[in-house]
């Protein structure tokens, strides 16, 4: 007890009290964060995500399995560029460890020469250090080079894999419209991928170097002070590591929430840019400012909590992984020196004792620092678990969507009050799609939205090539829904749909999409220049397509086919619609869906375009309210918005409606 009481000084008691108080605060903060997460509910911009399916973000077997799955993507083969960089980093880490040991030994000899007043020894070892500086510097910078290149290689591999899945068929559309598990995929595909790759490589370096140091220093120290010293340090590493890992568990979850809030903040800013004109007309800047400030405030509050948590953990990490580890190191290294009966130093001179202490002490200090870095690496590993959970969730959703599986909260037909609703729930993909040329036939197909809201219970009609169809009805009646089912963007919930393959259907929206690229790219999209050559279509033929829609003058005005502009801004609304029709003439599909695509075009130009479509054999499904277009169609499909429809042939007795 007396031996213990000498440590109960006022200073030590204060430090222990501060550490205990901080642990209590940290525990209280963790509980508060958990309660806040339960009470606050779901974020307003991501309220589709199911609480029961949130990904875990802790360091466990699940994390290691996920990490292994992603590493197989980033390092696909035994012999590849990434393996080469991993090997380079490993060699540089070993070289750096040996450089550290050599610098300790050489530095001790320099100091020994100074203390022993030996000018010869001092100059010799100092010259050795000067001669080794270029090599040591080269090793350090080769290590940095390898780490940076490996981060980039990992990012390239993972990004290409994810975009290969994301841009396969209509997956990018389905993720935003048919599945509600992932919010803000742009955040995941860009920032999260970069941070994940950086974190993986940093962890590889921050774990490999300390392990190498420990192995080498244990070998050196065991021969110098015995095996008991290194064994004591390893035992301390195990105990402190388990304790700190337990305290760090919230970091993974907090990392996931940070990235979600960052994604929300990025999303509301992109909405402001995309819809700036509409917002300006409504004078909605104050409302948008409130929205942005609200989302930003939520992000800032979370970051404040995260910063405080990291401050608390940093305080405890510093004490346990650095300073207490140093104290343990001093206790271990001092034993053979303070034990006067120790056989190692019975006949050692003062100079030999000093040199031995410096070498052993510095090695043990470096070993304790290496142990501390391994303990602190647990913090990085917990943060990596957060990124790993998000990337793995994205990969799983992409895989599901590419196999036709998606998850979305279904709206019950009883709640919607639709008469004649099916007793059994709708099953996505339950219908049959048959690919046949020159015909579109809906055979007892329920027209429903992805969340199960039935627009038409049983839709049946048949159209063959050459018979144009005019589709009309109030907003929300199902006109666009019909096209989405026809284009296979939405699942078929039942019945049989007979139609040509996707490439033989073409959709022209009211607001045409202008791609990034040249004037030629606007006409041939989504084809490229090589595809144009394969089709055997010359630039002169492209010029004829522009002339057909009265856009021939644009070729000279914009500086030729290879002119690059921001075409969404350069072209007017009418020019963009006519450009989309020129694009239609280039592709010459069997069927074309025209969704109010000539609303900004004059009647005479519109009349010529429809006549030309008939001339080149393109059958049209047209959504329009213009009476002038009835003469170009043989049938009309009218939807009343209450679940009823009428499909009839247009005759002289048909009452035309529209403007």
From Swiss-Prot:
The modification N6-acetyllysine is found at residues 61, 260, 399, 533. GO terms for biological process: bile acid and bile salt transport; bile acid biosynthetic process; fatty acid beta-oxidation; fatty acid biosynthetic process; lipid transport; long-chain fatty acid import into peroxisome; peroxisome organization; phytanic acid metabolic process. It catalyses: a very long-chain fatty acyl-CoA + H2O = a very long-chain fatty acid + CoA + H(+); a very long-chain fatty acid(in) + ATP + H2O = a very long-chain fatty acid(out) + ADP + phosphate + H(+); a long-chain fatty acyl-CoA + H2O = a long-chain fatty acid + CoA + H(+); a long-chain fatty acid(in) + ATP + H2O = a long-chain fatty acid(out) + ADP + phosphate + H(+). Glycans are attached at residues 12, 106, 206. The modification Phosphoserine is found at residues 424, 659. Ubiquitinated by PEX2 during pexophagy in response to starvation, leading to its degradation. Pfam families: ABC_membrane_2, ABC_tran. It is found in: Peroxisome membrane. Its EC number is 3.1.2.-, 7.6.2.-. The chain crosses the membrane at residues 84-104, 126-146, 224-244, 313-333. Residues 1-61 are annotated as: Interaction with PEX19. The keyword Cell division does not apply. It is a multi-pass membrane protein. Keywords: Acetylation, ATP-binding, Glycoprotein, Hydrolase, Membrane, Nucleotide-binding, Peroxisome, Phosphoprotein, Translocase, Transmembrane, Transmembrane helix, Transport, Ubl conjugation. ATP binds at residues 473-480. One of its GO terms (molecular function) is ABC-type transporter activity. It comes from the Eukaryota. Residues 434-659 form the ABC transporter domain. Residues 85-372 form the ABC transmembrane type-1 domain. Broad substrate specificity ATP-dependent transporter of the ATP-binding cassette (ABC) family that catalyzes the transport of long-chain fatty acids (LCFA)-CoA, dicarboxylic acids-CoA, long-branched-chain fatty acids-CoA and bile acids from the cytosol to the peroxisome lumen for beta-oxydation. Has fatty acyl-CoA thioesterase and ATPase activities. Probably hydrolyzes fatty acyl-CoAs into free fatty acids prior to their ATP-dependent transport into peroxisomes. Homodimers. Can form heterodimers with ABCD1 and ABCD2. Dimerization is necessary to form an active transporter. Interacts with PEX19; mediates the targeting of ABCD3 to peroxisomes. Belongs to the ABC transporter superfamily. ABCD family. Peroxisomal fatty acyl CoA transporter (TC 3.A.1.203) subfamily. This is ATP-binding cassette sub-family D member 3. It comes from Mus musculus.
């Amino acid at each position: 007890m007396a031996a213990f009481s000498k440590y109960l000084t006022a200073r030590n008691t204060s430090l222990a009290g501060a550490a205990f108080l901080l642990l209590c605060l940290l525990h209280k903060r963790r509980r508060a964060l958990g309660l806040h997460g339960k009470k606050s509910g779901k974020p307003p911009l991501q309220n589709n995500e199911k609480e029961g399916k949130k990904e875990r973000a802790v360091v466990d077997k699940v994390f290691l399995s996920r990490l292994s799955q992603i590493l197989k993507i980033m390092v696909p083969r035994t012999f590849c560029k990434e393996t080469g960089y991993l090997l380079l980093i490993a060699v540089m880490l070993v070289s750096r460890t040996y450089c550290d040991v050599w610098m300790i030994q050489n530095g001790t000899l320099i100091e020994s020469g100074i203390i022993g007043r030996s000018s010869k020894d001092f100059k010799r070892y100092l010259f050795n250090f000067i001669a080794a500086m270029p090599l040591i510097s080269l090793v350090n910078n080769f290590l940095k080079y390898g780490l940076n290149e490996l981060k980039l290689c990992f990012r390239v591999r993972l990004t290409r894999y994810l975009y290969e899945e994301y841009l396969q068929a209509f997956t990018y559309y389905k993720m935003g419209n048919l599945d509600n598990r992932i919010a803000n995929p742009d955040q995941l595909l860009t920032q999260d991928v970069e941070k994940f790759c950086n974190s993986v490589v940093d962890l590889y370096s921050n774990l490999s170097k300390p392990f190498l140091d420990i192995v080498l220093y244990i070998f050196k120290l065991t021969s110098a002070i015995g095996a008991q010293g290194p064994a004591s340090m390893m035992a301390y590493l195990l105990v402190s590591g388990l304790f700190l890992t337990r305290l760090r568990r919230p970091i993974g979850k907090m990392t996931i929430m940070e990235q979600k809030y960052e994604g929300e903040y990025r999303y509301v800013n992109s909405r402001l840019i995309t819809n700036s004109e509409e917002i300006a007309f409504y004078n909605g800047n104050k409302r948008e400012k409130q929205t942005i400030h609200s989302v930003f405030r939520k992000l800032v509050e979370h970051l404040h909590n995260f910063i405080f948590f990291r401050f608390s953990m940093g305080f405890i990490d510093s004490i346990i992984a650095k300073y207490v580890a140093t104290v343990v190191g001093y206790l271990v290294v001092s034993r053979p020196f303070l034990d006067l009966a120790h056989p190692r130093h019975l006949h050692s001179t003062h100079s030999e004792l000093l040199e031995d202490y410096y070498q052993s002490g510095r090695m043990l200090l470096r070993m304790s620092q290496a142990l501390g870095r391994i303990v602190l690496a647990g913090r990085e590993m917990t943060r990596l678990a957060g990124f790993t959970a998000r990337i793995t969730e994205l990969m799983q959703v992409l895989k599901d969507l590419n196999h036709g599986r998606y998850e979305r909260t279904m709206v019950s037909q009883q709640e919607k009050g639709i008469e004649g609703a099916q007793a059994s729930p709708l099953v996505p993909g339950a219908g049959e799609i048959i690919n046949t040329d020159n015909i579109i036939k809906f055979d007892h197909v329920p027209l429903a939205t992805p969340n199960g809201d039935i627009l038409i219970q049983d839709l049946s009609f048949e159209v063959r090539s050459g018979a144009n169809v005019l589709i009309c009805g109030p907003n929300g009646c199902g006109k666009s829904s019909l096209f989405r089912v026809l284009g296979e963007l939405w699942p078929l919930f039942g019945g049989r749909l007979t139609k040509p393959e996707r490439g033989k259907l073409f959709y022209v929206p009211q607001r045409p999409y202008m791609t990034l690229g040249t004037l030629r790219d606007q006409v041939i999209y989504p084809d490229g220049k090589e595809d144009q050559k394969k089709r055997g279509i010359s630039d002169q033929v492209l010029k004829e397509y522009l002339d057909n829609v009265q856009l021939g003058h644009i070729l000279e005005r914009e500086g030729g086919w290879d002119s690059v502009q921001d075409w969404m801004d350069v072209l007017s609304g009418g020019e963009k619609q006519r450009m989309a029709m020129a694009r239609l003439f280039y592709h010459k599909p069997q069927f074309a869906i025209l969704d109010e695509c000539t609303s900004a075009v004059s009647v005479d130009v519109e009349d010529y375009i429809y006549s030309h479509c008939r001339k080149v054999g393109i059958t049209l499904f047209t959504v329009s309210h213009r009476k002038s277009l009835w003469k170009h169609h043989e049938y009309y499909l009218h939807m009343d918005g209450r679940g009823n429809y009428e499909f009839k042939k247009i005759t002289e007795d048909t009452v035309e409606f529209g403007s």
